[in-house]
A protein has these predicted regions:
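Active-site loop/oxyanion-hole signature of alpha/beta-hydrolase fold enzymes
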Residues: 52, 58-98
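Conserved HGGG/HGGXW glycine-rich cap/lid loop of the alpha/beta-hydrolase fold
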Residues: 14-69
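A conserved amphipathic alpha-helix that caps or lines the catalytic cleft of carbohydrate-
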Residues: 45, 91, 114-115
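Glycine-rich, phosphate-binding/catalytic loops in enzymes
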Residues: 44-49, 73-75, 119, 142-146
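N-terminal cap/lid segment of alpha/beta-hydrolase-fold proteins
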Residues: 1-12
Length: 179
């Protein structure tokens, strides 16, 4: 996986590219879930690039993966801020010409907010997997269980494999839902 860092608004963001560049083909931008990062996409980006002939770009938001840490708690507007402020800068920086945003969970919400708030003619489509359009008690109960597993089980150890700042990644996600 060819990774490189992007400097965006004073933050270092981990990014990776698969397949052709933005001058050669449309680009599919992957937006990860609340505890995700570039590495957790595993071989999906390479397979997606091969199957579609498109370039695929993924990045780890600040606080995740190998990206810069962030101060906690996150503001409740963090997904809106990412969609309206950070994502447009990333698209510009990578030379995004046209393509789609593909998001899972928090990433799907960010893609949805971006599509609704930014009139970006380069974004031709969005594919959303489990965006946060409403909250269910079952989901909140699962997030509380994740906190228990993180604090008293082995979830922290497992996440530390993927996140340089594991407490930042976990509590940035968990706290946004439970605080």
């Amino acid at each position: 996986m060819p990774t490189h860092n992007l400097e965006i608004s004073g933050q270092t963001l981990e990014g990776a590219w698969w397949g052709p560049g933005p001058d050669a083909a449309p680009t599919l931008v992957l937006l990860h879930e609340g505890l995700g990062c570039v590495g957790l996409w595993n071989d999906f980006p390479a397979k997606l690039a091969e199957a579609t002939g498109c370039g695929v770009f993924a990045y780890s938001r600040a606080g995740y993966g190998k990206s810069s840490p962030i101060p906690l708690p996150r503001p409740l507007s963090y997904m809106h801020d990412e969609a309206r402020e950070t994502l447009p800068k990333i698209l510009d920086r990578i030379g995004f010409r046209e393509g789609a945003l593909i998001g899972h969970s928090d990433g799907a919400s960010i893609a949805l907010i971006h599509a609704g708030a930014i009139a970006d003619p380069r974004v031709k489509a969005v594919a959303l997997m489990a965006p946060h359009v409403f909250t269910e008690e079952l989901g909140l109960a699962s997030i509380r269980q994740a906190q228990e597993a993180y604090e008293h089980g082995d979830l922290k150890r497992k996440l530390a494999r993927w996140h340089d700042h594991v407490d930042c990644a976990f509590y940035g996600w968990n706290g946004a839902w439970l605080d």
